[in-house]
């Protein structure tokens, strides 16, 4: 639970041995926060939690397809490519929405965007519930994708702009915590409805009431004070700040906001790619960071968790859904400490730890799966009802074949088929027992699908199966403390307020575009090169992300958004290696500025810029 403090009380989450303040002299001496920086009252907490409900809904929608797909692919007789399209259609909607989301957020406000996205969630969910065809299913998933993209961007920006600077990391990361809780509930729902007829409709419909309630609640919450200042409503912004900070005098914080926004009205979208205020470097950092979020493989674990777990030995839909629930539990448990400690430890440290552990776990997972000797997975087989009946007698899994016909089983034991064949089940009614056998018939009328005939399940050590699951869980845990929550905190901080919405929308487009590409090809690539080599590719990407974080990502804990913007505007930001700026206060801040208040530091820095002197940033804790 987030500690709540009144206007008079000190911070309850100070880093040990260091002052938690963000203004000049008070921070250096370990004194209390100024009133405008202290305010993390109940109203701020309530607004942040209500907005973060979007995170829960996003997580639920991202995770629910993992189990729903197991039922839908059989009901609608989906091919491998169609399964990929069902999963990826959500990402198509998200990508399309991200292209216009920034304009909506900057023009109509962060709160209005959240309300609109909740309405889209309800509409898309209704379409999914009544969908009776592949086409309507795709349409509903696209609508859900629009909700996810718009909601994700608006929520991060909204919380970052209403939070006091010393609680910003905690409150923004709350959104990621809600996302993983939503994923966990999605996996629980997958398990609960795994054996219920048309259970996928219940899975898709459970979130509608919560989405409606959030839209209503957000209507009564305040707009972002920074957005109000951007629109010229300074009096309204002052009132909102007073409620959020639980203080009467908001002059100082309002002055800082106005000063930081004064020169930002002239930003255009194309300024993101120009050298002005070093925006080109900032957008490069943002785009590369979200690239690594996706290219390290986490989306595939999220969307195809149940499918992948079936391929490594968790055989039934129910068993695979239950195992994927463990993935959700690990995500929640791992995200909680990252959320609570981000303001003390810093986002950069968590990113480094997460990328390192991800690489180690992926190597282990790849080596283990090499030893399982999976000659082929049955992920892409045809899931028609006739093949579903076959599943009762023939088990498809890594290193497994079992059939009621013992002679058939012995005949194929140890054999591997590398080419495609059309397999159909035939029902032997001659002996009256209705035993199922296999017939490999060319041009049998069924779609071309791939099967594996390999060794008995007894040949696959149980230890390897569980070690593979353990490696997967460690990988998920590492992602949940690093590349899961931290990039969105960094993105909400590194762009100036006047262009933040458009910058977030562009990085969101990159995020969804890469996600779409990876998810749309995962099953195909896995069939082509095998799961072990997919793991090794993700390992290389995790190590590359570690190097990128060390070199380029700033440590912004304890700094105000205005201070961060001033520092990143330096043309020699990367050359000066300011990545660990929290540990180099005296090098970064002229002594004459250290005793001044934040707004004075900001204005003085602007004067220094006009004289051709380097722009400096007040350090955080």
From Swiss-Prot:
Membrane side Extracellular: residue ranges: 70-84, 133-141, 190-201, 304-321, 371-470, 524-532
Compartment(s): Cell membrane; Endomembrane system; Cytoplasm, Perinuclear region
PTM section of the record: N-glycosylated.
Signal peptide boundaries: none
Membrane topology note: Multi-pass membrane protein
Region spans: Disordered: 1-33
A Pfam family reported for this protein in Swiss-Prot or TrEMBL: Sugar_tr
Superkingdom, taxonomy of origin: Eukaryota
Carbohydrate-modified residues: 195, 375, 387, 400, 405
Membrane-traversing stretches: 49-69, 85-105, 112-132, 142-162, 169-189, 202-222, 283-303, 322-342, 350-370, 471-491, 503-523, 533-553
Protein's UniProt keywords contain Zinc: no
GO annotation, cellular component aspect: endomembrane system; membrane; perinuclear region of cytoplasm; plasma membrane
GO molecular function term, any single one: D-glucose transmembrane transporter activity
Reactions performed catalytically: D-glucose(out) = D-glucose(in)
Side Cytoplasmic, residues: 1-48, 106-111, 163-168, 223-282, 343-349, 492-502, 554-621
GO biological process, one term: circulatory system development
InterPro entries the record matches: MFS_dom, MFS_sugar_transport-like, MFS_Sugar_Transporter, MFS_trans_sf, Sugar/inositol_transpt, Sugar_transporter_CS
Alphabetized PROSITE patterns for the sequence: MFS (PS50850), SUGAR_TRANSPORT_1 (PS00216)
Keywords: Cell membrane, Cytoplasm, Glycoprotein, Membrane, Sugar transport, Transmembrane, Transmembrane helix, Transport
The protein's role, per its UniProt record: Insulin-independent facilitative glucose transporter.
PANTHER family reported in the protein's UniProt record: D-XYLOSE-PROTON SYMPORTER-LIKE 2, SOLUTE CARRIER FAMILY 2, FACILITATED GLUCOSE TRANSPORTER MEMBER 12
Protein name: Solute carrier family 2, facilitated glucose transporter member 12
């Amino acid at each position: 639970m987030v500690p709540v403090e009144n206007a008079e009380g000190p911070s309850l989450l100070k880093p040990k041995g260091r002052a938690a303040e963000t203004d000049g002299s008070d921070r250096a001496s370990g004194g209390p926060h100024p009133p405008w920086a202290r305010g993390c009252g109940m109203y701020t907490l309530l607004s942040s939690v209500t907005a973060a409900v979007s995170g829960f809904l996003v997580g639920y929608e991202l995770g629910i397809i993992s189990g729903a797909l197991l039922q839908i692919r059989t009901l609608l007789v989906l091919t491998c490519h169609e399964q990929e399209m069902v999963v990826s259609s959500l990402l198509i909607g998200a990508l399309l929405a991200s292209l216009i989301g920034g304009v909506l957020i900057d023009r109509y406000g962060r709160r209005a965007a959240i309300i609109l996205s909740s309405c889209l969630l309800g509409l898309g969910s209704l379409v999914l519930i009544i969908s009776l065809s592949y086409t309507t299913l795709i349409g509903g998933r696209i609508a859900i994708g629009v909700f996810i993209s718009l909601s994700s961007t608006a929520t991060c920006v909204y919380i970052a702009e209403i939070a006091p600077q010393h609680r910003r990391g905690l409150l923004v990361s709350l959104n990621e915590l809600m996302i993983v809780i939503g994923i966990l509930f999605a996996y629980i729902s997958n398990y609960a409805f795994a054996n219920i007829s048309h259970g996928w409709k219940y899975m898709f419909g459970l979130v509608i009431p919560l989405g409606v309630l959030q839209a209503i609640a957000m209507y009564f919450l305040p707009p972002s004070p920074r957005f109000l200042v951007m629109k010229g409503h300074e009096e309204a912004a002052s009132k909102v700040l007073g409620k959020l900070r639980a203080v009467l005098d908001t002059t100082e914080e309002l002055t800082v906001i106005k000063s930081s926004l004064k020169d930002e009205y002239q930003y255009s979208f194309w300024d993101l790619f120009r050298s002005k205020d070093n925006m080109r470097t900032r957008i490069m950092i943002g785009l590369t960071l979200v690239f690594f979020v996706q290219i390290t493989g986490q989306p595939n674990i999220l969307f195809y968790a149940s499918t992948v777990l079936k391929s490594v030995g968790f055989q039934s839909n129910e068993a695979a859904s239950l195992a994927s629930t463990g993935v959700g539990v690990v995500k929640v448990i791992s995200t909680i400490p990252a959320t609570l400690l981000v303001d003390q430890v810093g986002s950069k440290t968590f990113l480094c730890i997460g990328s390192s552990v991800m690489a180690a776990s992926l190597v282990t997972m790849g080596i283990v799966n090499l030893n399982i000797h999976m000659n082929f997975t049955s992920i892409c087989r045809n899931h028609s009802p006739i093949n579903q009946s076959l599943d009762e007698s023939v088990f498809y899994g890594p290193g497994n074949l079992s059939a009621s016909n013992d002679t058939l089983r012995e005949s194929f034991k140890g054999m591997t088929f590398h080419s495609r064949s059309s397999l159909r089940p035939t029902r032997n009614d001659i002996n009256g027992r209705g035993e199922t056998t296999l017939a490999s018939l060319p041009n049998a009328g069924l779609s071309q699908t791939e099967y594996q005939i390999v060794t008995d399940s007894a040949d696959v050590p149980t230890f390897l199966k569980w070690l593979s699951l353990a490696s997967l869980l460690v990988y998920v845990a590492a992602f949940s403390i690093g590349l899961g929550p931290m990039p969105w905190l960094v993105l909400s901080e590194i762009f100036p307020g006047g262009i933040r919405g458009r910058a977030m929308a562009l990085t969101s487009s990159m995020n969804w575009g890469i996600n779409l590409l990876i998810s749309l090809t995962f099953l195909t690539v896995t069939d082509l090169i095998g799961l072990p080599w997919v793991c090794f590719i993700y390992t290389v990407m995790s190590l590359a992300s570690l190097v990128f974080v060390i070199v380029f990502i700033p440590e912004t804990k304890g700094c105000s958004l205005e201070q961060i913007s001033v520092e990143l505007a330096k043309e020699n930001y990367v050359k000066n290696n300011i990545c660990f700026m929290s540990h180099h206060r005296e090098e970064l801040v002229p002594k004459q500025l250290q005793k001044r208040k934040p707004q004075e530091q900001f204005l003085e820095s602007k004067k220094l810029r006009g004289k051709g002197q380097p722009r400096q940033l007040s350090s955080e804790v």
